[in-house]
């Protein structure tokens, strides 16, 4: 049977040029790349040039730096993300010219409509889990299309157009836009209090939105959910679709056990239902949270009848995702043992705790130096005590000012205030640094032989590890 893609649907053939406002964003750039590979003319704009915009331009995307009304001239449709305000000149021009404007998730939903969609949702672990599922499907010769929120190291991209019916993508709950998706398989890794402004500060609304997302599955679809997460398990009775669970919990359908970590390497087993053989697995990523992410991928692959060898090989050969415990290497510090440099995207207290736990499990005798940049004043305010608690568990803390992500400052939710509160706990004495450019000098002054240095957060702290590596930690 011939596969139907979005470009082969007669109604879509009127669409020629698709313009993305904010094309440098992780989710936007992935969709743009897939559509480009399907034969559409793609243009896009962003406020500043980046590795992502340069890569897209090299592929043939017409990239504008800066937002201007003339950028949408000739566009058949304009795609925007929730980060773009309605007063953006390109959106205003599109409305004036009656050019259709669609949200990023709506376009992803159109891509998914004509394929066997696998959507991965959850507060934490979406990118890694989506990447692991894609890796296993590729190892099983399924050749999936994938759209993820980080750089898949094996592909050198955050998106790829496959020839099969499979499309694997992250489902974003931050603005509830994942409700535009209608996949065949939905994964929920966990549910935590984040992006609460979208849900008017009401956690019950967030939970109901996840239920609504799962009910977008057809009656023959499948929900794969984490049996270790108390909020997820609380929702299971309300899900009127087939459900399989995964986790460390004894009652999970796909149960991870016998976990052994040696540095960044994990070995573990997964017991499976219905007479399926228990799998012995290897993953070159540390942390029990990544065991859960991998077990979710095993559950999806097993339900999709992927061969056991492909599951094992897909995990064993997985090369990781950019900024997800990305190890930059070991660097000489005086005459003693080398110091290791790691970069990680986690910016929620639970994610930071998972990173710290991975270090303590894999390198129990090494000092942990964390350079942390809080992301958004609202998140810092809402989870203030959680941040104080988790950041007090490192050995040395360098605290950058909050990365605003467009928000106005909130009194008491800045990093100077956070630093003072952590200091009063008497466990860690933070070093406050205003901007990333001041960090290399601080690291040079405090680094000790054998240290593990982690640059942590979702803002421009992500540029720091590369700079520190270039300077040999100084």
UniProtKB/Swiss-Prot annotation:
* Positions that bind ATP: 122-128
Task: Identify the metabolic or biological route this protein is part of.
Answer: Cell wall biogenesis; peptidoglycan biosynthesis
* Keyword line: ATP-binding, Cell cycle, Cell division, Cell shape, Cell wall biogenesis/degradation, Cytoplasm, Ligase, Nucleotide-binding, Peptidoglycan synthesis
Say which species the protein is native to: Saccharophagus degradans (strain 2-40 / ATCC 43961 / DSM 17024)
Task performed by this protein: Cell wall formation.
This one is known as: UDP-N-acetylmuramate--L-alanine ligase
GO BP of this protein? cell division; cell wall organization; peptidoglycan biosynthetic process; regulation of cell shape
Q: What does UniProt give as GO cellular component? A: cytoplasm
Instruction: Give the reaction(s) catalysed.
Output: UDP-N-acetyl-alpha-D-muramate + L-alanine + ATP = UDP-N-acetyl-alpha-D-muramoyl-L-alanine + ADP + phosphate + H(+)
Any idea of its EC number?
Answer: 6.3.2.8
| Source species taxonomy | Bacteria, Pseudomonadati, Pseudomonadota, Gammaproteobacteria, Cellvibrionales
